[in-house]
């Protein structure tokens, strides 16, 4: 699996950052050690270039090619990933916001397996557009980029997201924001995903990936892992509530059902102290 590729190399510094942040209750902190950082002028240059690209006919062609390539990759790569709860998708016929836990650069392929036959775009950091090679190609044409630029986020991003949802696409937004490598617990979500679902009046397709350490060595630091993607109860905006109240209600309901699944699967309270087992497959070093 592609996710196995990311289990190689020394992740001890990242895991130490996760432990520190979890122990201190900072569940949305950035923990990766080598993420690129852009200043505002660099962000605006990337935004402008991306928006120019979207207006060209080649962008439409490449977007459809990216969808075909990533769909084929997901089908092959996730053939051993179990998906449960498809019955919870009954009645989801158009655009939707998808939420899931963010623990690996490759876990979105599992969400694509759940989407099966639906176009899925991913909301990701603007820095992804600077990647080169095949991965950079996928990021450019399969991602809706977000930025710290308030003007872009207030004007351009809602247009991009709303347009995608209106076309019937699913859009994956990570409410946990930052990736915590191989971390198994659901983390308290931020409101953005649910705000956009309420604003554009689309359902929230709630996903959560559970992981099982097989005990079979894969790398020097990690065992091979089995993954199960759970599709939980779909959440829908209440027409009697405001956008703000809807977003808060769906955020709380989504986190609650993810926590319930976690506690049922792992037999541990969501607020138990951090342990090495929280980083699934990792061989803790003394």
Name every feature range the model reports, one short phrase each:
Residues 1-97, 106-110, 135, 140-141, ...:
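Membrane-anchoring hydrophobic helices of lipid-metabolizing enzymes
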Residues 59-62, 123-124, 150-151, 182-184:
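A generic secondary-structure micro-motif detector
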Residues 70-71, 111-112, 135, 161, ...:
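Short amphipathic alpha-helical segments and helix-helix/interface helices
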Residues 71-72, 140-148, 176-179:
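Short, basic, glycine/proline-bearing loop/turn elements
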Residues 79, 104, 150-155, 186-187:
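A conditional alpha-helix N-cap/helix-loop micro-motif detector
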Residues 92-151:
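Catalytic core of membrane glycerolipid acyltransferases/transacylases, capturing the structured
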């Amino acid at each position: 699996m592609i996710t196995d590729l990311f289990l190689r190399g020394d992740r001890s510094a990242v895991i130490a950052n996760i432990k520190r942040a979890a122990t201190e209750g900072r569940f949305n902190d950035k923990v990766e050690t080598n993420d690129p950082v852009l200043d505002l002028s660099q962000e605006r240059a990337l935004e402008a270039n991306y928006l120019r690209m979207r207006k060209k006919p080649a962008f439409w062609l490449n977007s459809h090619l990216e969808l075909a390539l990533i769909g084929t990759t997901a089908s092959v790569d996730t053939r051993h990933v179990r998906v449960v709860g498809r019955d919870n998708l009954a009645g989801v016929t158009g655009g939707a916001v998808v939420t899931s836990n963010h623990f690996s650069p490759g876990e979105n392929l599992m969400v694509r397996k759940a989407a099966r036959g639906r176009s899925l775009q991913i909301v990701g950091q603007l820095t992804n557009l600077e990647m080169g090679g095949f991965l950079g190609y996928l990021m450019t044409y399969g991602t809706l980029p977000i930025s710290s630029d308030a003007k872009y986020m207030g004007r351009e991003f809602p247009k991009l997201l709303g347009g995608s949802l209106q076309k019937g696409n699913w859009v994956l937004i990570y409410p946990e924001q930052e990736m915590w490598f191989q971390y198994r617990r659901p983390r308290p979500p931020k409101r953005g995903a649910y705000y956009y679902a309420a604003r554009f009046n689309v359902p929230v397709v709630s996903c959560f990936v559970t992981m099982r350490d097989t005990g079979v060595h894969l790398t020097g630091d990690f065992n091979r892992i089995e993954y199960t993607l759970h599709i939980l109860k779909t959440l829908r905006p209440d027409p009697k509530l405001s956008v703000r109240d809807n977003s808060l209600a769906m955020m709380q309901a989504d986190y609650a059902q993810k926590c319930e699944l976690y506690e049922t699967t792992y037999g541990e309270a969501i607020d138990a102290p951090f342990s090495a087992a929280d980083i699934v497959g990792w061989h803790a070093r003394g």
